[in-house]
From Swiss-Prot:
Transmembrane segments: none annotated. It comes from Bacillus licheniformis (strain ATCC 14580 / DSM 13 / JCM 2505 / CCUG 7422 / NBRC 12200 / NCIMB 9375 / NCTC 10341 / NRRL NRS-1264 / Gibson 46). GO terms for molecular function: amino acid binding; aspartate carbamoyltransferase activity. Belongs to the aspartate/ornithine carbamoyltransferase superfamily. ATCase family. Keywords: Pyrimidine biosynthesis, Transferase. L-aspartate binds at residues 77, 160, 211. Heterododecamer (2C3:3R2) of six catalytic PyrB chains organized as two trimers (C3), and six regulatory PyrI chains organized as three dimers (R2). This is Aspartate carbamoyltransferase catalytic subunit. It catalyses: carbamoyl phosphate + L-aspartate = N-carbamoyl-L-aspartate + phosphate + H(+). Pathway: Pyrimidine metabolism; UMP biosynthesis via de novo pathway; (S)-dihydroorotate from bicarbonate: step 2/3.
Length: 306
């Protein structure tokens, strides 16, 4: 049994193995090795891509799928997340995929539940499967990470994608640049260098845009003039290197962080990221449940990612 809660739990070997497995699955490798097992998807925040990507991945692997949201569970009656997951485990769930608004929600689960927990996003914390699909997309484009420059633009402070990606890209040998409004800088993130939007775009092999995380701000941020000041406008896109590509974890706010004309342009890999997400999540689910480590063992502690 192997949880996945944060990217720093994965070794470089783990990352390469997951990407390679996802690539084989994408080629059409038939795989229903998890047939008959139950996956519980528990989402306490809105989600389109991550939620349905996991569901498609689970069904491609032959799994039975239980979809829950915070409104339809007994959490609304005061039940703790821990008791909810223990309930799902007791009625037969083999793995639990969770998105939650609280950072590190999984701390109360790891070592106390007998099924794998896969983090589908925790507040401003981590989003490991998004990072993995981003890495897969970059590797498909370049065949490497070392020596690349990846710039991350926008709401760095509130973005779990920025936090997950900056750490792992640095570990893989890429250079990370940050760009965005001063008030959205993440001073606790040591993995990137802050530069101007123009400098970031001009020097990057991969330009990764982020949406404004309105739901994590105390008051709604102004979007007026954001595109021209900080986003990837058509004018700023003229600075892109010849082979540079555009990425975005989505949802995309067209005309805010990126000009609408660029979303489906020849440089964009945004929908390729979404496609790759299915296969990465298939690989993550297989890793969680196979290799003889999926036996439920009560409440004992587990060592992550042996």
């Amino acid at each position: 049994m192997k949880h996945l809660t944060a990217m720093n739990e994965l070794s470089l070997e783990d990352i390469h193995e997951l990407i390679e497995e996802a690539r084989e699955l994408k080629k059409g490798k038939s795989d229903s090795v998890l047939s008959g097992k139950f996956a519980a998807n528990l989402f306490f925040e809105p989600s389109t891509r991550t939620r349905f990507s996991f569901e498609v991945a689970e069904k491609k692997l032959g799994m039975n799928v239980l979809n829950l949201d915070g409104v339809s569970t007994s959490v609304q009656k005061g039940e703790s997340l821990y008791d909810t997951v223990k309930t799902l485990e007791s009625i037969g769930a083999d793995v639990c995929v969770i998105r939650h608004s609280h950072d590190h929600y999984y701390d109360e689960l790891i070592g106390h539940v007998g099924i794998p927990v896969i983090n589908a996003g925790d507040g401003c914390g981590q989003h490991p499967t998004q990072s993995l699909l981003d890495l897969m997309t970059i590797h498909e484009e370049w065949g490497r990470f070392a020596g690349l420059t990846v710039s991350i633009h926008g709401d760095i402070k509130h973005s779990r994608v920025a936090r997950s990606n900056a750490e792992v890209l640095t570990r893989l040998g890429a250079k990370v640049l940050f760009s965005g409004p001063d008030e959205w800088r993440d001073e606790d993130n040591p993995y990137g260098t802050y530069v101007s939007p123009d400098e970031a775009v001009a020097h990057s092999d991969v330009v990764m845009l982020l949406r404004i995380q309105h739901e994590r701000h105390e008051k709604k941020a102004a979007e007026r003039d954001y595109l021209e000041t900080f986003g990837l406008s058509l004018k700023r896109a003229e600075l892109l290197k010849k082979d540079a590509v555009i990425m975005h974890p989505a949802p995309v706010n067209r005309g805010v962080e990126i000009d609408s004309a660029l979303v489906e342009s020849g440089r964009s890999r945004i929908f390729k990221q979404m496609e790759n997400g299915v296969y990465i999540r298939m690989a993550v689910l297989k890793r969680a449940l196979l290799n003889g480590e999926n036996k439920k063992r009560g409440d004992q502690a587990y060592v992550l990612f042996n």
